[in-house]
Amino acid sequence: MGTFRDAPDVYGCIGKIFEEAIADPEIGPKTREAALSICFNFTDPESVIYVDFARGDVFFGDDAPDTEPAIRMGMKADDANKFWLGKLNLVMAMAKGQVRAKGSVPEMLKMLPLAKPLYARYEALLRDQGRDDLIQAAG
């Protein structure tokens, strides 16, 4: 079993950082320029986050649109947590099969530099929520 309690727990942490990225005055416009949609299918616990960067929308679970995203990604929620804490190299994780990706992966990789400034914000978000357990679990 993973560190997250349930799907709403994933949405309140990982989903929240996507919302903050889109709302950020510097990062948000750059994500909209990329005009990608990414559907993240997490395990441990089962949860779905669909991010439509072009429209600036984040959807959780059954609220995810039926439209096919440009990219589908699959991973454990704990691995997404590690990524947002700067402790998981996404390219290496994909090479090892720890993270699966289908679709416009090269376009998604171009967006990776936008994530780095959010690592500290994600850690602060977890601390504000009293989720030191997620920080410690990332190693």
Feature map (PLM): residue ranges:
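Feature captures hydrophobic
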Residues: M1-G139
